[in-house]
């Protein structure tokens, strides 16, 4: 019994047949068609996905009556409604020598693609091969589980019967249509099952939305905490700059009030006072820089404490190694940033959907930590711009630093570039920390 399909897909394909196989077009050279058109042509077909992925290559067959049936088609598992079908035939060397300018260079038969079809399985016309005649050249007929189909553009003609069928009078008996109780019972069960499925889908959707909102709120809390720390750091740095500017203005005013003597003794004393002032200003600058360094180390230590709630500093799965320092001044020497390994990340993300979401969130936290530490705290430029968007962060506005459920080749190439650029930023910042010289 044929099944009714809402949508025909690759997995419903059972057999492929080609009608009117020919090496020549219908409007080709009539002389060649007459001479070589009636021979047996060895053929096979190639089945590909719409993305160019190879699905199946058939065996070579030579059919009779210009018709080939490939019945040993394996069971496909694809869910796509589009396929690419190619028919490949063996062209004899005699034909190649006839149409080629190089007569001596062709000695063997050649395999050539006779036709290529991009087929939408839901846009085919149903046919019955026993009652219609297909007139097109190399016309495919696809046998699916719900019937036989050919291309919508193919021309078909109904076959005329050799013997006219016997005509008889139509019975006048009225048929009364009825519906059995068992059919109604089955329909009721189907409706109950459908309603249960819809209820379960709604419950699962609501749970997913609740989990997503809770995770989103948690990320917002981290962002607010980090933003408050950044604002506090900027205010303290601004106050330090103002105090430094006031010291400079006071020194300039004190220098303007010095009485210039015309004697050599007064000039010597003036030089000595200038040297003393220079020494005092330099020492104050050193003190201010030392306070600024202390402030940076303190903010870095606070930032590390904030990110300790994530797994960035986990000894097994984390990306940052940090050993508790003996003093705040030693915090940058205890901080070690690890570069990303694309092979390890691909293996972890491919285990399950939960592992992929975990890896994406950790990559987002790592990017945010590097951005805040380098740009906000140490004011150090990085070669590539880091943009934090949670578990879908990007680099330079175009390279995604996250994994998807379907890793197409284009996304994977951009992801590899993003990891390369991110490792370059890590290397740049590690060199800055190694060359950083606090007072």
Swiss-Prot record:
Membrane topology of this protein: Peripheral membrane protein
Keyword Protein transport: yes
Entry's localization field: Golgi apparatus, trans-Golgi network membrane; Endosome membrane
Keyword Transport annotated: yes
Residues in coiled coil: 223-255
Null mutant phenotype: Abnormal reticulophagy.
Comment field (misc): Present with 1070 molecules/cell in log phase SD medium.
Family affiliation: Belongs to the VPS38 family.
Name of the protein: Vacuolar protein sorting-associated protein 38
